[in-house]
Amino acid sequence: MPDLPEPYHPLTDDRFRLLVDAVVDYAIYMLDAQGRVASWNSGARRFKGYREEEVLGRHFSCFYTPEDRQAGLPQRALDSAAQCGRFEGEGWRLRKDGTRFWCHVVIDPIRDSAGGLIGFAKVTRDMTEQRAAEQTLKQSEQQFRLLVQSVTDYAIYMLSLIHI
């Protein structure tokens, strides 16, 4: 007689929290409807540098550069997520120690059963190393283009001397 399958146990709040906290390559946290940090995972702690008790209740704009805060980017991101169903972008953010890191950000609205906005889910990934590699590749490509152009210009110059 075959074994009966074990009963399915959906994720409880505790198990879901364990799942989110196990993800260390992404900062996954919730903001309330005003943009204050309402939850914090180990990935956020790892690359932003804040412990949960240091950041809960703080407005998420503290992760933005002064220039982006001055330009109103944090509020525009929340407004876009609330109105369009999602905000996605890349930019510089700040760690607790003040150092900058380049990141990819996704913000999704969280709504209650009546459709009212109750907060936002925010997922951030540190892309600093990838961006540095892209910048190095771009520089290398530019240098190669300049070299090819210089060789081409020199060849044209030499050919023009031969035909004179």
Task: Write out the residue ranges for each language-model feature.
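Output-coupling edge of small sensory domains
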Residues: 92, 108-113
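PAS-family sensory/regulatory domains
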Residues: 42, 54-68
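PAS-associated C-terminal cap
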Residues: 1-15, 113-116, 125-142
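Sensory-domain boundary capping and coupling elements
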Residues: 105-107, 124
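PAS-family sensory domains
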Residues: 30-32, 38-42, 46, 64, ...
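Conserved small/polar residues in nucleotide/adenosyl-binding loops
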Residues: 162-164
